[in-house]
């Protein structure tokens, strides 16, 4: 109750997005045309132009964000990735798999380092009210949360799953059913633990190393909460999987019976068309289940994350009020209508989604009460730092 009262006593500022779908649509059309005309060379400039438009039109507490990266800043990095891509293809086509594997592993080893450097560069080139964001972390921590920890968790869950299979017996039909149910439960819980734990640790690590000017962000997520909703999201998918699986299995049996008993070509064609129709229905049910599960998980984790994010020892807090149904129908519209229109509706629907997310995201407090001072930091120099700029991960809401 005290937390509610405290939040009601402080000013609340919702994020406001001033962009329009029509303007963003024109930007995307021009970008696509220029990218085609230049045979892909303009792509870095196109991507940065879109991001600058989105950032420049996002406002909070009366101030708009600024994004200072241009296509020229990341062009060299893109060239390096193109070089690696064609080098790997050439080694594979030249029947030199060993060299191809070495190049691929080299790129993967560098990728985590480059992602951390790229995230730092993105943060430093993003500002609000003239104050830059910053991201500083140890590479040991990055390797732990993004590489070693997932591998150790995967090995641990694989071991548990293997031991579970050895402990179960399938001496009768009833024991087979019990074994399948228990293995499904173990699998669902394992996936939930893996996803929930990783989300909690990765987000806590990223934002605990992020600052706004001289002020640090803090976030302490409830790992049990994240695991719970990761499991519930997967459970929400199961009914759709069951229905889609039943339809597919039924069609496989029908196809087998038809191949045995049907002799008429016209009858075979009709049965084939009917099978294709039901297969499409099964796929649509499956994809809708994915949308339901994804929207549920996204909203649950985002709202939890925002409610636990703070700046300057809690003087500035955040809140998210996204809803499951709001995310679901916007996500479905983004995929379905964009697909039907060949991508033409995507810019309009993306702006619609961003505007809704902004209206349901709040800053609790007043940034003007903080000393708005920049850290004395500059983007990293050197070859590795330069090629890392094309790795463009971004912190949520940055």
Curated annotation (Swiss-Prot):
Subcellular location: Cell inner membrane
Sequence intervals crossing the membrane: 25-45, 74-94, 96-116, 143-163, 176-196, 229-249, 279-299, 334-354
Segments on the Periplasmic side according to the record's topology features: 46-73, 117-142, 197-228, 300-333
Bilayer topology annotation: Multi-pass membrane protein
UniProt-listed Pfam families: DUF898 (PF05987)
Cytoplasmic compartment segments: 1-24, 95, 164-175, 250-278, 355-398
Alphabetical list of InterPro entries matching this protein: DUF898
Keyword Amino-acid biosynthesis assigned: no
Gene Ontology CC annotation, any one: plasma membrane
Alphabetical UniProt keywords: Cell inner membrane, Cell membrane, Membrane, Transmembrane, Transmembrane helix
Protein name as it appears in the record: Inner membrane protein YjgN
Organism: Escherichia coli O157:H7
